[in-house]
Curated annotation (Swiss-Prot):
Gene3D superfamilies to which the protein is assigned, alphabetical: Lactate dehydrogenase/glycoside hydrolase, family 4, C-terminal, NAD(P)-binding Rossmann-like Domain
Binding site for beta-D-fructose 1,6-bisphosphate: K156, H171
Positions with a binding annotation for substrate: R91, N123, P124, V125, D126, D151, T152, S153, R154, T233
Gene source species: Clostridium perfringens (strain SM101 / Type A)
Entry protein name: L-lactate dehydrogenase
Activity regulation statement: Allosterically activated by fructose 1,6-bisphosphate (FBP).
Function (record text): Catalyzes the conversion of lactate to pyruvate.
InterPro entries: L-lactate/malate_DH, L-lactate_DH, L-lactate_DH_AS, Lactate/malate_DH_C, Lactate/malate_DH_N, Lactate_DH/Glyco_Ohase_4_C, NAD(P)-bd_dom_sf
Catalytic activity as recorded in UniProt: (S)-lactate + NAD(+) = pyruvate + NADH + H(+)
Protein's UniProt keywords contain ATP-binding: no
Modified residues (Phosphotyrosine): Y224
Length: 317
């Protein structure tokens, strides 16, 4: 009897994002084994127990907590551990706090799962993904950040609300940093095959284009608005992470705006940024050299320089 290959996923961090991601993965039936690791072992144990007791309602999955040794031979290791921005802080304000945490996490993950794909979710995600790449010694394809997959979903949702259509029929991308310097790629935005400006003219008698100024700011501020009200974000980001995991494990060749290592694309080098990228079983297979506008390219380069500056001033070395 030939047994189907099992998929083992480990999640480092049992906070709001980590535990909700475990729930989303469990619901989606992507993994046969999920291991949750956290410095607070009681918290990790409780989250795993709570999830495991719903096993009768989902596809067969073994959910448990443990230490790094229990993550051995994981296919994907998702890193959600770290401190999040407090009200009034930006993602970039917490670099060195999370860098210290990552210096303790990444070597342990690499030790036990040297062939895994590392999926970084903790913020600032682009910088921490670059740091993970440097600390792990893994090939660039196997170190992936969640990038702007969530931001892109937020924009699709907002455009769908604006035009009163299904979000799945909106095609657009947020590129660059997952943060304040991110760029809305309006040049790549289309609905029903029509550029968003042309589509707007066909459905709106008074299309002044103001949404192109308003919605990007709403996307940038969405997380801060949620954090100010409930203290954290967890649901949408967990769904975004699950979508990335799905693309990897199912070898989809899906195009997602994950954070990938730039090596000369658009004149940018040696920094992780979000860009439409082919995601398959190898991880982030290829950044697509899509035709963005000159203004978008200039802003992408500025975004890269901002991140490089923060990396240079970090305590990486």
């Amino acid at each position: 009897m030939i047994r189907e290959k099992t998929n083992k996923i480990s999640i480092i961090g049992a906070g709001f994002v980590g535990s909700t991601t475990a729930f989303a993965l469990m619901q989606d039936g992507l993994a046969s084994e999920i291991v949750i690791v956290d410095i607070n072992k009681d918290k990790a144990h409780a989250e795993a127990m709570d999830l495991a007791q719903g096993a009768a309602f989902v596809k067969s999955v073994d959910i448990k907590s443990g230490d790094y040794a229990d993550t051995k031979d994981s296919d994907i290791v998702i890193i959600t551990a770290g401190v999040g921005p407090k009200p009034g802080e930006t993602r970039l304000d917490i670099i060195n706090k999370n860098l210290k945490i990552f210096k303790s996490i990444v070597p342990e993950v690499v030790k036990y799962s040297p062939n895994s794909i590392l999926l970084v979710v903790s913020n600032p995600v682009d910088i921490l993904t670059y740091i993970t790449y440097k600390l792990s010694g893994f090939p660039k394809e196997r170190v992936v950040g969640s990038g702007t997959v969530l931001d892109t979903s937020r924009l699709k949702y907002m455009l769908s609300e604006h035009f009163d259509i299904d979000a799945r029929n909106v095609h657009t991308y947020i590129i660059g940093e997952h943060g304040d310097s991110e760029i809305t790629a309006w040049s790549l935005t289309n609905i029903a095959g029509a550029n968003v400006d042309e589509y707007c003219k066909t459905v709106c008698a008074n299309c002044d284009g103001s949404f192109k100024k308003e919605l990007p700011e709403k996307v940038k501020n969405a997380a801060y608005e949620i954090i100010n009200s409930k203290g954290y974000t967890n649901y949408a980001v967990a769904l975004a992470v699950t979508r990335i995991v799905e693309a990897i494990l199912r070898d989809e060749n899906a195009i997602l705006t994950v954070s990938s290592l730039f090596e000369g694309q658009y004149g940018i080098d040696n920094v992780y940024l979000a860009m439409p990228t082919i995601v398959d079983r190898s991880g982030a297979r290829q950044i697509l050299d899509v035709p963005i506008s000159n203004e978008e390219k200039e802003n992408l380069i500025k975004s890269a320089e901002i991140l490089k500056g923060h990396i240079a001033n970090s305590e990486l070395d």
